[in-house]
């Protein structure tokens, strides 16, 4: 397992504050959201996996934002379809 350095990951994100936000969002996705890792897990914890993904350029703030927007739109569409089917059945 290659060691992840903060400096390498900060260079990919821009600053250490955004790094904390992006890496924690991604780690939470990996741990609770049922998202698959984009790098081999190698028995690492979600936080380390998130940092490795950032270091390799696989995860960015814009990518996370786009994925969350897409998931929200899909959820909204499913809810709208469910409500429509209920109102049409009356």
UniProtKB/Swiss-Prot annotation:
Chemical reaction(s) catalysed: RNA(n) + a ribonucleoside 5'-triphosphate = RNA(n+1) + diphosphate
Keyword vocabulary terms for this entry: DNA-directed RNA polymerase, Nucleotidyltransferase, Transcription, Transferase
Region named Disordered: 69-90
One Pfam family hit: RNA_pol_Rpb6
Functional summary from the UniProt entry: Promotes RNA polymerase assembly. Latches the N- and C-terminal regions of the beta' subunit thereby facilitating its interaction with the beta and alpha subunits.
HAMAP family to which the protein is assigned, alphabetical: RNApol_bact_RpoZ (MF_00366)
NCBIfam families: rpoZ (TIGR00690)
Protein name according to UniProt: DNA-directed RNA polymerase subunit omega
Lineage: Bacteria, Pseudomonadati, Pseudomonadota, Gammaproteobacteria, Vibrionales
